[in-house]
Curated annotation (Swiss-Prot):
Function: Functions as part of axonemal radial spoke complexes that play an important part in the motility of sperm and cilia. Essential for both the radial spoke head assembly and the central pair microtubule stability in ependymal motile cilia. Required for motility of olfactory and neural cilia and for the structural integrity of ciliary axonemes in both 9+0 and 9+2 motile cilia.
A GO cellular-component term linked to this record: radial spoke head
Biological process (GO), any one: axoneme assembly
Protein family: Belongs to the flagellar radial spoke RSP9 family.
Keyword Cytoplasm in annotation: yes
Keyword entries, A-Z: Cell projection, Cilium, Cilium biogenesis/degradation, Cytoplasm, Cytoskeleton, Flagellum
Classification of source organism: Eukaryota, Metazoa, Chordata, Craniata, Vertebrata
Quaternary structure and interacting proteins, as annotated: Component of axonemal radial spoke complexes.
Protein name: Radial spoke head protein 9 homolog
Record's keyword annotation contains NAD: no
Source organism of this protein record: Xenopus tropicalis (Western clawed frog)
Cellular compartment(s): Cytoplasm, Cytoskeleton, Cilium axoneme; Cytoplasm, Cytoskeleton, Flagellum axoneme; Cell projection, Kinocilium
Length: 277
């Protein structure tokens, strides 16, 4: 959610469970504009909160360039006032993060210990070695945010366009989805570069607009039923919740450009989802 519409956006997702306290909201309204100005960012959004045992990580996302799918900067704060820059997420960070189980502690310097199994040699003489590896919680936080973005960050169809330079930018002509369109999962896209593009037939491609239909639709997600879509607050706001990453909530006010997503959760993937649907 954008820093400029923080109060309204928090009100729209208030029915999704834990939120931010009045003190946190007041601190964010004061600190986010300063972060935006000091780093000369083009855009700044509140990404969410990763809940820890001793402290919570408040996450903000900034962009220094026009492309909203590349060059993102992630920041975290333990008090909603002082912000620290997170290292860029890499495939190695994500792989390391997937090997760690349990809640976040709330201390960026905390070190986790996990075992990596390597196979040495080949054939009948192959030996499996167990290596103990350490990873800091700050790196785990980076990898977790990247995984949530890949699997649960959402944008409505038409809200962003790809220009002739290949940059993904805000579509200023977007006026919101109709209520009838907003009730369909096909009207929402994963707001992340496509990892496994779905092959489409010529008939399907003919019905698409390449400037706005360049992302993956939620209707093809596996397993089916991993999203909950409903109208709330007197049918005035569309709410889309991820059941894979509990705490990720997307909101959109129909017939207006107002939309966004917020994550407030423990940073753990819901591995029980296949047994719940």
């Amino acid at each position: 959610m954008d820093a400029e519409t923080l109060s309204l956006s928090l009100e729209l997702v208030s029915g999704s469970g834990p939120g931010l306290s009045a003190e946190q909201c007041a601190a964010l309204r004061a600190s986010l504009p300063l972060l935006h100005r000091d780093l000369r960012l083009r855009r700044l959004r509140l990404w969410g909160v990763v809940l820890g045992l001793r402290g919570d990580y408040v996450i903000a996302r900034g962009w220094g360039g026009p492309d909203l799918l590349r060059g993102q900067l992630s920041f975290y704060s333990l008090n909603c006032v002082d912000w620290c820059l997170l290292p860029p997420a890499t495939d190695a960070h994500i792989a390391q993060t997937q090997g760690i189980k349990g809640r976040f502690v709330g201390d960026p310097a905390h070190e986790y210990e996990y075992i990596v199994r390597n196979t040495a040699g080949g054939g009948d003489s192959a030996l499996e070695e167990e290596l103990t590896t350490h990873i800091k919680e700050e790196v785990r936080l980076t990898g977790t945010i990247a995984m949530i973005d890949r699997e649960a960050a959402v944008a409505p169809r038409g809200a962003y366009i790809r220009n002739p330079l290949g940059q993904v930018i805000v579509n200023h002509s977007f006026r919101g989805l109709e209520v009838s369109e907003g009730k369909k999962l096909s009207s929402y896209f994963h707001f992340t570069p496509s990892l496994n593009p779905k092959k489409k037939s010529l008939l399907e491609k003919a019905a698409l607009d390449p400037s706005i239909d360049f992302l993956d639709s939620l209707e093809h997600d596996i397993p089916r039923g991993s999203w909950s879509l409903q109208l709330e607050q007197g049918d005035s706001v569309l709410i889309l919740r991820s059941l894979l990453w509990l705490g990720m909530t997307f909101y959109h006010v129909p017939l207006t450009p107002l939309h966004g997503h917020l994550y407030i959760g423990t940073g753990e993937r819901n591995l029980d989802l296949p047994f719940m649907i």
